[in-house]
């Protein structure tokens, strides 16, 4: 099972709000998911990003691949750097 960390769109029409979820890559964008690890609200100024760091690191270590947008959000929060240091032992 190929697992991805990606955005699940929530909210009303023209006012999107996203949940950052871990899901099987074959399931639909807003469909079935395994676990929610955070939220992202692009409408606030600045954009509000809340990510559970422990869960994100756990899933990255288990081989989950983040989507491009989630990769950018994780690096803004410093989580990808911590994952890199854990993986390569710095």
Swiss-Prot record:
Q: Which GO terms describe its cellular component?
A: cytoplasm; small ribosomal subunit
* One protein family per Pfam: Ribosomal_S16
Q: Name one GO molecular function term.
A: structural constituent of ribosome
Please state the span of the N-terminal signal peptide per the UniProt entry: none
**Stored NCBIfam families:** S16
Return the similarity comment. Belongs to the bacterial ribosomal protein bS16 family.
For this entry, the protein name equals: Small ribosomal subunit protein bS16
> Where does this protein come from, organism-wise?
Anoxybacillus flavithermus (strain DSM 21510 / WK1)
């Amino acid at each position: 099972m190929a697992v991805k960390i990606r955005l699940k769109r929530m909210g009303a029409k023209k006012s999107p709000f996203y949940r950052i979820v871990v899901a099987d890559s074959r399931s639909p964008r807003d469909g079935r998911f395994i676990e929610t690890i955070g939220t992202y609200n692009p409408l606030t100024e600045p954009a509000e990003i809340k990510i559970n760091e422990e869960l994100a690191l756990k899933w990255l270590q288990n081989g989950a691949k983040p989507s491009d947008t989630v990769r950018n959000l994780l690096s803004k929060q410093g989580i990808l750097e911590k994952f890199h240091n854990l993986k390569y032992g710095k």
